[in-house]
Amino acid sequence: MRRKLVIAVIMAVLGSAFSASVSNASQVEISATSVKPIELKQINSKLRIVSLANGAAEILNSLGLRNSIVGRDIASTTPELKAIPIVTSGHQVIAEKVISLKPSLVIIDASIGPKSAIDSIKKAKIKVASIPEAWNLQDIQKKVLAIGKLVNENSQARNLNGLMQKATIQSKSNLGWQPKVVFLYLRGPSSIYLIGGPGSGADSLVGALGGVDVGAKTLKTPFNTLTSEALIAANPDVFLVMSKGLQSVGGVSGFLKLPGVAQTNAGKTKRILSVDDSLLLSFGPRTPALLTKMSEALKAMK
């Protein structure tokens, strides 16, 4: 449900990546183009894979199986995957497109639908396999191993996990302070304003960097309706948002006009960390590099 909530809205607004920018020490943007995935050498495989599960295409690419991917979901936007056909409309699978590609394997997760499309693919005698979703740093390794098992590349999966684990450890450094962070999910035109709580995904990133996700400490569910009272009570030092979300409310100036924002420490100091929509909660081969960028940004905001 969480994945459907986030991705369904992201699909409508994903666009080209922005260059990384720092307007001043308090406002930092991390773009998709500024973060590189960890990749293994490309290998030959006879598999024909349609990757529909969130982040699966990116992991397959990093396992060295880019040439085996014959179809992908619209959320897989990294440059390496650009030439691969999209087989979804928004977040809805188009069964006819999938079947026409004659895949030997279709990878899905719990968020993929509609069920009728998946059933049609199965009726066409095509293997459909479901993998676990990743909502925190610990889930990444399980997801990579699950995909590695499906494609008979267990050794490659273990190697990739080892490289990512090493890079994740190296990404962490002393921030020099323990910032209180609030993650806001914003979609202005759709009037969607949510504050992240425990299990939003952002809490795992913030905690790994040595910060405190205030929403995760004080709220009960992954995503909660944003209120001025909740923001003022949380009183974060830094706001974490998605880049398109920030744009959707009119950029920094519009963001500061949202109820309660200007009354917080983060609002007063304009400490806003924005991250590309396809990157922030991707939890995959780009995550270690993302953590490095986030660490650098939070240090600069001290």
Where are these regions (language model features)?
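Short helix-initiation/N-cap motifs at beta->coil->alpha
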Residues: 33-35, 85-96, 218-228
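Structured C-terminal subdomain patch of bacterial secreted/periplasmic proteins
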Residues: 30, 47, 139-152, 158, ...
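Flexible loop/hinge segments that line or gate small-molecule binding clefts
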Residues: 76-80, 115-146, 150
